């Protein structure tokens, strides 16, 4: 074992932990005042339940053995046998450190889904959905890509830090939930505004900070690959931020803090699958292109298709993750990271690109089917959506009996 690597991974795990509270601020600032507490509480409860599930069954199902390349096994249930010595996934850090790092991924991923259901989903229905979704969608997908003998890893599909496992699955599942729940009441008549711009930027800043642990830590050692991932993360986020601002200038005539915050987040999403595979110049391209892809993707989803993906979980994470997976297939280099078996399409090889496309289709299929199964099970026990009066009053009061702004008595 290496003490420096161990300290680095534990620190990165703490960085990734910060991302979930950051997401709570990011989402909380975007919703209406009557729903901010509920929106943030959705992230807070996941911080608790995801840790318990990970220790009891999640780590074992994701990384404990292999069954048909789809799911792990039972040998690490309850962290039984997860020791302070190195495990099968990293030679220089304890198995416990690797498990702690991956636990934070299992925390942030389901929290991303909540952006699609803001303002209209019963809290108890969401709790049950997230528990089932982690079991049916996230743990199998994590195993397929990162676990020993995982199906997608075997065919050569790569995902350095979760741009596909985390963002495609959560974004697509959010879209399925949004379609199932239907639009917020008055969605077609009203104009929804961000209620707290500083919250949005604070959340984006915490996400960017935590993302360094997310991507650099996925090197699983304090080495050159970690430094490379750190820099590609910085470059893509910066390029996407500037790109989004330029789009706003040309389309709206002005830049916005919310737009810049959104741009940097989708830049982080886009580089995540390829942070440890693509060269620095490709990170610039990845960030520059993800903003128009997501910007016009959101316009299509909300403007043309009239789908109420409330906080653009699919528009930003789903679409951004898909682009990131494709970009990895275009620009990946074996000389940067030998985990990639082949070079990307721009270097004259096709196999990595094909493997990435297959992987993306699998992520989407598993997320759609898995989410529909979860929804069907939840409906056995409780309706998904709050009643009309509860939605009008706001979910802060109707679901939690508290108000983020005690002096506020309106319906906005």
Please provide the spans of the model-predicted regions.
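Glycine- and aromatic-enriched membrane alpha-helices
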Residues: 1-412
């Amino acid at each position: 074992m290496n003490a420096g690597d161990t300290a680095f991974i534990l620190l990165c795990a703490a960085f990734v932990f910060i991302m979930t509270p950051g997401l709570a601020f990011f989402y909380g600032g975007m919703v209406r005042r009557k729903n901010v507490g509920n929106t943030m509480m959705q992230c807070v409860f996941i911080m608790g339940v995801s840790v318990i599930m990970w220790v009891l069954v999640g780590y074992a199902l994701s990384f404990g053995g292999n069954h048909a390349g789809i799911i792990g096994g039972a040998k690490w249930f309850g962290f039984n046998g997860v020791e302070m010595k190195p495990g099968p996934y990293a030679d220089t850090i304890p198995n416990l450190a690797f498990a702690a790092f991956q636990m934070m991924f299992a925390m942030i991923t389901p929290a991303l889904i909540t952006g699609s259901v803001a303002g209209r989903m019963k809290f108890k229905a969401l709790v049950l959905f997230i528990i089932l979704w982690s079991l049916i969608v996230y743990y199998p997908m994590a195993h397929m890509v990162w676990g020993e003998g995982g199906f997608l890893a075997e065919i050569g599909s790569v995902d350095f830090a979760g741009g596909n496992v985390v963002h495609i699955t959560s974004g697509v599942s959010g879209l399925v939930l949004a379609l199932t729940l239907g639009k917020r009441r008055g969605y077609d008549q009203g104009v929804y505004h961000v209620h707290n711009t500083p919250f949005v930027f604070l959340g984006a800043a915490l996400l960017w900070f935590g993302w360094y642990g997310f991507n650099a830590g996925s090197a699983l050692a304090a080495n050159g690959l970690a430094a490379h991932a750190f820099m590609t993360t910085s470059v893509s986020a910066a390029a996407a931020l500037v790109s989004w601002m330029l789009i706003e200038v040309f389309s709206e005539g002005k830049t916005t803090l919310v737009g810049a915050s959104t741009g940097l987040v989708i830049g982080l999403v886009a580089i995540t699958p390829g942070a440890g595979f693509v060269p620095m110049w490709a990170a610039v391209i990845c960030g520059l292109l993800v903003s128009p892809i997501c910007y016009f993707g959101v316009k299509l989803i909300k403007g043309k298709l009239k789908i109420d993906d409330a906080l653009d979980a699919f528009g930003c994470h789903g679409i951004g993750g898909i682009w990131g997976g494709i970009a990895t297939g275009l620009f990946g280099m074996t000389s940067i990271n030998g985990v990639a078996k082949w070079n990307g399409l721009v270097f004259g090889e096709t196999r990595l690109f094909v493997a990435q496309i297959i992987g993306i289709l699998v992520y989407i299929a598993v997320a759609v089917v898995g989410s529909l199964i979860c929804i069907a099970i939840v409906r056995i026990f409780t309706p998904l959506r709050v009643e009309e009066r509860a939605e009008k009053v706001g979910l802060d009061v109707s679901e939690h009996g508290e108000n983020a702004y005690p002096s506020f008595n309106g319906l906005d």
